[in-house]
Amino acid sequence: NAITGEVSTLRGKKWLVLNVTDSHDKAFRKEGISWWEQERITQDDINKALISLAQHNDKVDFIFSHTGGTEVNRMLGFKPTHSDFMLDLVLNTADYDQHFCGHYHIDKLCDKSRILYDDIMLIASSDENDWIDIDGVFNITEDIKLKRLMGEIIND
């Protein structure tokens, strides 16, 4: 299972999942129905991620989060949120190859952050049948599925 703030290993690649988002339109949403307080990252989540990174010499291959951090927001012309600044604490500490996020409903490479919407990316595999798609399905030979870019891995 992918647990926010913990480094996991899959197919020989290390990756970190962070539950990071802020509903920028929550004034128009209803708490517990269309937005949830627990979608916001906490200081405990950040501390857990930094400790987990330190146990791996701050090196991971991939970081997955919903939003992209302050730099991505600025590059896209958006005002960064509290969660973006929190994510930066991890992105600025980690030595990583690629950061994947969604949220913006576009496909774009912003430095080391890859925003996914329609793109299909091959990661962590030499097997052409292993892929990640924008609907959040992570297809592996054992039918393990990643239901959302930020979600948890479940075995079907």
Task: Locate the predicted segments by residue.
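Alpha-helix C-terminal capping segments
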Residues: 9, 56-57, 91-94
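A short C-terminal boundary segment appended to hydrolase-like catalytic domains
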Residues: 45, 137-156
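Active-site metal-binding loops of divalent metal-dependent hydrolases
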Residues: 6, 19-22, 67-68, 102-104, ...
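Conserved beta-sheet core of the metallophosphoesterase superfamily
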Residues: 70-138
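Short acidic-hydrophobic surface loop/beta-edge motif
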Residues: 4-12, 109-111
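Short, flexible, glycine/charge-rich loop motifs used to bind or transfer phosphoryl groups or to couple energy/partner
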Residues: 5-6, 49-54, 87-90
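Active-site-proximal loop/helix segment associated with metal-binding centers of metalloenzymes
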Residues: 11-79
